[in-house]
């Protein structure tokens, strides 16, 4: 019996599971899924958990059940790609015939002194819970500094504003205009929403140091009762420690078939993979679809195509609290209630089809 090991239960490997189970898995292949949590977490909603507008229950999805699916739990310390083993701190290694690395990402602090020690995070469900506890326990008129005004920072700031209108919220953005990679009309809409809802945006920010209760912007100190870091990501440490070829962002360079060069048994999906698009749940799922096709061909002894089709991504949706949002769908900017409703609908569909 061949063993396919899925290293991490994120969006990419969940899509692999749902494509292979219940009836697309060859009779001579079993699957082992490894994760630290006994459920799949909706990472795209961690901002709402941290802001206190949803509970754990709303962002947990059970792993599927199947006679040839074995779910194992533990904290992975390393992957031995020569011996084809996944190593743990407190349990025996797990061997694989084929494996898909889907360990996701962590915060990237850009060598800013004090940032790892004195900021909160929304990168894992445990970190998001810790951030919620801190934000929820703040007294009225306390100040929250959110460093980084990408999608995560924007959604956290807006959700927190809706949850705690008594807080002073500062959002640090390194660009001239918030969400500057989006069309200007959309960026101005988001900037105006924050202005109307009393969220202070500091554009052209450059965080040079963080101390307990203090953010230094261009070396100027700004006091805050809580500091949340949403200013960049990097691959999981297990991936960073792998001695394989990586791109400038530390993501693993792959063949057109999504496996490591020279190792057709080890694949990488999602945030750890070097791909032509920014990391996202949507991209991880699109890549997973192709990996499943490649695995099935290899298991069946069929020839592989020289290249795989380009990914067709539908767009991006973001929320501004529960009633407003923004998005870019088929290169068309959307603002207001419609993108928020679309995002809520997609979340419901995901939970309905995967739960």
From Swiss-Prot:
The keyword Membrane does not apply. InterPro entries: FAD/NAD-bd_sf, FAD/NAD-binding_dom, NADH-Q_oxidoreductase. GO terms for molecular function: oxidoreductase activity. Its EC number is 1.6.-.-. SUPFAM superfamilies: FAD/NAD(P)-binding domain. Keywords: FAD, Flavoprotein, Oxidoreductase. Binds 1 FAD per subunit. Its cofactor is FAD. Transmembrane segments: none annotated. Belongs to the NADH dehydrogenase family. This is NADH dehydrogenase-like protein YutJ. It comes from Bacillus subtilis (strain 168). The lineage of its organism: Bacteria, Bacillati, Bacillota, Bacilli, Bacillales.
